[in-house]
A protein has these predicted regions:
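Flexible hinge/capping segments at coil-to-helix
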Residues: 71-92
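A ligand-binding cleft/hinge motif common to bilobed small-molecule-binding domains
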Residues: 27, 33, 41-53, 102-106, ...
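Ligand-binding cleft/hinge of the Venus flytrap
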Residues: 6-16, 98-123, 130, 152-158
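Extracytoplasmic small-molecule ligand-binding "clamshell" domains
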Residues: 1-44, 201
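Short helix-initiation/N-cap motifs at beta->coil->alpha
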Residues: 18-30, 76, 117-131, 135
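Hydrophobic residues within well-ordered alpha-helices
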Residues: 9, 32-33, 68, 84, ...
Length: 223
């Protein structure tokens, strides 16, 4: 999806020569910071730490839907993130540098009388979190929906064996942005204008419908 949006942006900015290079998350982040790449996109969220290293267009490209992975036997009790907080459910740890950590921290700031216990940890993988929820050590795991689909829901997913015992509860959308090298201020401004035009003329909405079957912007207004 985001590549398709950036291809549409490229058509609006023919004064630049565009070369699209598939790469890993780490190489993208390091490459844009170092200048190896001018701009990058890969479901990137804006965080204070990233704003120190990169510049962002004002307009987002799309949104990542984020939510809770819970056991099916808890589905009658936990139907939303508010239910997790009300029941004092245990949320699996999140690495403090992970943007998902900020999602829960922001939720707790907005709900000071009904906080979720936010535990930080760096020594685990997605498979650990899924297993912990399955075993009952934790009641929920905060996960990006696309990751849940790729890791569990799809038939060829690596942890598809958990699919009949886990469910996904949507919480909200997090804006995703193009990431620009700090020296490329003019390019960032022009990309921002192009994204704004693509949203106004309906191009981005059409691409969201094509790739996701719905508009993701509605999820950005949820608190």
């Amino acid at each position: 999806f985001e590549v398709a949006v950036m291809q549409a942006v490229a058509k609006k900015l023919p004064q630049y020569e565009w070369k699209f290079t598939p790469t890993s998350d780490d190489d993208l982040l390091i490459g844009v910071e170092s200048g190896k790449y001018t701009i990058g996109t890969k479901g990137i969220w804006k965080t204070p730490a990233r704003e120190k290293k990169y510049i962002f267009p004002k307009n987002n490209i799309g949104a990542s839907v984020i939510g809770l992975v819970i056991r099916k036997d808890e589905a009658a009790t936990i139907k939303s993130i508010d239910d997790l907080a009300k029941t004092q459910g245990k949320l699996a740890p999140i690495a403090p540098q992970d943007a998902r950590y900020n999602v829960i921290a922001s939720y707790n700031t907005a709900h000071p009388d009904q906080k979720i216990n936010l535990v930080s940890s760096e020594n685990f993988h997605n498979s650990d979190a899924y297993t912990w929820v399955m075993e009952g050590r934790y009641d929920a795991y905060l996960e990006v929906e696309l990751s849940y689909q790729n890791n569990i829901a799809k038939e060829n997913a690596p942890y598809h064996r958990f699919a009949d015992q886990l469910v996904y509860l949507r919480y909200k959308g997090i804006p995703t942005y193009a990431l620009v090298n700090k020296k490329e201020v003019k390019l960032c401004e022009e990309v921002d204008k192009a994204i704004e035009e693509l949203r106004k003329d309906g191009t981005i909405d059409k691409l969201e419908q094509k790739y996701f079957g719905e508009s993701l912007q509605k999820y950005l207004n949820q608190k």
